[in-house]
């Protein structure tokens, strides 16, 4: 089916919502097929059952933050040592997803979904998180797209190129990543309060797709999910209960739903066993979400001026704290019988410069070889053009084995300590680092405000996680007036210096994107927001949460009911 959303006609119809549920987003007949009374009732049930738990978990995050801000550092929890030391395993891996050597990721856009499913990757992670700007239109179209993808009818007609896209006979297995616990969905009010974004994402997707998915993709299992940005196992416990609730509603076996948790916050690295334990009936492993992890390192240590990061480009997987995290993740997953997934190299193909392209591909190749040799069972690709390289690295090492869960134990990683996981990254800080953060942060935010959650910038993939690093690093450097020691000039970062950098980088952006795009895009608004966040006395928790209201579009309702 081709997706054609209706032309907006104000106030002609409203969604058929159950009691206590108010949909404030634009009405569209196509969206109404997703926002059915039954599906909304399911979302409302989830919201009512779990909102107290979610609020408590968010309060615990704030409490932990207060402790870190008073000088504490995260570490292993003595009270859950029995879980770390215990002899237990997760449920066995469903055959449909035993082989996950290359997974492609991307936002839930129609053409991207078709391209990703056809890409030759084993898995496609359809993203409502880092790669999506969660506007009402993006979210609802995303659900329509996923439903069409799961039932196999999805097509897309690119009119400018007169090209029709449809699914191949063989496609990647679909995983869906709902938003993190922290993000509200302001277009759906439940009992007068914005719904929890991830419960909307999960609830709508699950409700409409579980039956078909299990039949066609999961060989009796599924649906499959990726779970982002958790900080503690109590958050995994909520997800486990959500899954059990959904399985009960659907009348399917407990343990049908499976999820891979991204370890992408610093506190969560100390909770990997505990997270797997909570989800042991529903787990298919952990993934190294390296970009959010770096962001989280800065956020966790926002009040620790002795733990400043060097230039963003220097914080890679070669840093001791990053390597330790990846090694410990592999050991933990394999001990518990599940996949240890690698992460995303940020390089993407460079079409107009063969030499630069070869260098970019070589960086990806090296990153993937490092991952597979370390024992990872699979990895992420940001772009279809990277899949052959990722495949080659993983297949070259693993051969026909679907994964390395049983063959690579990494017992040596048992010796990794809290100090290893927290070791301060090494490297210099430069004015160019400050400039690049500023240029990337502003352009990313401008894209996000106008509906794109992942964009190519300076030949790299940028999304919410990578842009967060730019924001918090600028904040940290300004807050502590750090010396730019890589320039040899002894310059310290100040609000004044940052102000000049912003002005100059805005001029550069205008030159690079052209006057028209600069005028019609939201660069000036993005600049204001980004500057405010970088110079705020208190660090905002999330870039996207702080500016979310700018993409909320409430439509008046109740004029007539169809
Ligand atoms: C830190 C993290 O969370 S990582 C996970 C979240 N981030 C992501 O998922 C980012 C995914 N990647 C992307 O969004 C894109 O690759 C971008 C934005 C970086 C670059 O996209 P583009 O500028 O469209 O790339 P480009 O023009 O080279 O695309 C060429 C073709 O590949 C397709 N393509 C590019 N990336 C993807 C993808 N990830 N999935 C499916 N198709 C893709 C394009 O749709 C285009 O298709 P077409 O030839 O049929 O028109
Ligand atoms: O979600 C992935 C990350 O690196 O962040
Ligand atoms: Mg992430």
Curated annotation (Swiss-Prot):
Superkingdom, natural source: Eukaryota
Single GO BP term: glyoxylate cycle
EC number: 2.3.3.9
Catalytic function, reaction form: glyoxylate + acetyl-CoA + H2O = (S)-malate + CoA + H(+)
Subcellular locations according to the entry: Glyoxysome
NCBIfam families documented for this protein: malate_syn_A
Name of protein: Malate synthase
Species the sequence originates in: Arabidopsis thaliana
């Amino acid at each position: 089916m081709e997706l054609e959303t209706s032309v907006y006609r104000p106030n002609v119809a409203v969604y058929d919502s159950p009691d206590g549920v108010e949909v404030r987003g634009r009405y569209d007949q196509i969206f109404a097929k997703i926002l059915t009374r039954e599906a909304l009732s399911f979302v409302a049930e989830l919201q009512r059952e779990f909102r107290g738990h979610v609020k408590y978990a968010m309060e615990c995050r704030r409490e932990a933050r207060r402790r870190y801000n008073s000088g504490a550092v995260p570490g292993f929890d003595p009270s859950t040592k029995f879980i770390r030391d215990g002899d237990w395993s997760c449920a066995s891996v469903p055959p449909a997803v035993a082989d996950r050597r290359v997974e492609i990721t991307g936002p839930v856009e129609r053409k991207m979904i078709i391209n990703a499913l056809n890409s030759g990757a084993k898995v496609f992670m359809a993203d409502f998180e880092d790669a999506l700007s969660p506007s009402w239109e993006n979210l609802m179209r995303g659900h329509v797209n996923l439903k069409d993808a799961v039932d196999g009818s999805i097509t897309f007609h690119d009119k400018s190129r007169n090209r029709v896209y449809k699914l191949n006979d063989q496609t990647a297995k679909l995983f869906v990543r709902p938003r993190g616990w922290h993000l509200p969905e302001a277009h759906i009010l439940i009992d007068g309060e914005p719904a929890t974004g991830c419960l909307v994402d999960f609830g709508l997707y699950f409700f409409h797709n579980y039956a078909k998915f299990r039949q066609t993709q999961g060989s009796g299992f599924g649906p499959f999910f990726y779970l982002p940005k958790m900080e503690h196992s109590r958050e995994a416990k909520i997800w486990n209960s959500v899954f059990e609730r959904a399985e009960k509603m659907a009348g399917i076996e407990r343990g049908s739903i499976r999820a891979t948790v991204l370890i992408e916050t610093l506190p969560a690295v100390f909770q990997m066993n505990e997270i797997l334990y909570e989800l042991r009936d529903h787990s298919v492993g952990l993934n190294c979400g390296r970009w959010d992890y770096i962001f989280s390192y800065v956020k966790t240590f926002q009040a620790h001026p002795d733990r400043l990061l060097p230039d963003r480009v220097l914080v890679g997987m070669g840093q001791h704290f990053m390597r330790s995290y990846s090694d410990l993740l592999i050991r933990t997953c394999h001990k518990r019988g599940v996949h240890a997934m690698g992460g995303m190299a940020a390089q993407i193909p460079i079409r107009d410069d063969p030499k630069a392209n070869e260098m970019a591909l070589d960086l990806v190749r090296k990153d993937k070889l490092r991952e597979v040799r370390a024992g990872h069972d699979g990895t992420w690709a940001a772009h279809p053009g990277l899949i052959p390289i990722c495949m080659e690295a993983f297949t070259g090492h693993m051969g026909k084995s679907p994964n390395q869960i049983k063959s690579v134990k990494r017992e040596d990683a048992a010796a990794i300590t809290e100090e290893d996981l927290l070791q301060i990254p090494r490297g210099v800080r430069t004015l160019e680092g400050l400039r690049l953060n500023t240029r990337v942060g502003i352009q990313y935010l401008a894209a996000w405000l106008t509906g794109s959650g992942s964009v190519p910038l300076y030949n790299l993939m940028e999304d919410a996680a990578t842009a967060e690093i730019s924001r918090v690093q600028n904040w940290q450097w300004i807050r502590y007036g750090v010396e730019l020691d890589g320039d040899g000039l002894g310059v310290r970062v100040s609000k004044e210096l940052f102000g000049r950098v912003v002005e100059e980088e805005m001029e550069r952006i205008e030159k690079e994107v052209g006057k028209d795009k600069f005028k019609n895009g939201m660069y000036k608004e993005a600049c204001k927001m980004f500057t405010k966040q970088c110079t705020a006395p208190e660090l905002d928790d999330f870039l996207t949460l702080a500016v979310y209201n700018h993409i909320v579009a409430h439509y008046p309702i109740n004029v007539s009911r169809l």
